[in-house]
Amino acid sequence: METERYSIIFSSSTGNTKELADTIYEVLSKEKCDYFGVSKEEPQSDKVYIGFWTNQGNADKETLELLKKLKNKKIFLFGTAGFGGSQEYFQKVLGQIKENIDSSNTIIGEYMCQGKMPQSVRERYVKMKEQPNHMPNLDMMIKNFDRALSHPDRNDLDKLRKMVVE
């Protein structure tokens, strides 16, 4: 059976999603790759790996705009979220994203993991904590930030490798 041609298109604000994209590219046959990188154009490949970073519980704007254009594609979604550690949260994000995908497409896989955030985010949380009437969950948000510093890690990338099939 001949392997389908594919494209890997991603948006990466901090480098986390690019790391996932690089991992997918390592697993798949290079000869079958039509495109690898950032793009707003609809790919010619029938199979498309679409990478995103999470913004307020959904994919980034550029990725959502691209997904809305796709028709009759086999789509593998992959992404990162600074707020992570919960499969329930990841499923909620993926559910939001799928609402932007035309029903003519087929989702062939999906993967999300936590990703590190810029240090400025932690600094903002610490500053907010200095306020007398700060949000009660700031300690949890700071712990989450610290937990995210090592992600995506080797375990995250190994899980992704196992999910990617040609």
Q: Where is each model-derived feature located?
A:
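Intrinsically disordered, low-complexity regions enriched in small/polar residues
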Residues: 8, 12, 37-38, 91, ...
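N-terminal beta1-alpha1 ligand-phosphate binding loop
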Residues: 2-27
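Short acidic low-complexity segments
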Residues: 33-45
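FMN-binding flavodoxin-like domain, especially the glycine-rich phosphate-binding loop
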Residues: 3-4, 27-31, 47-51, 55-166
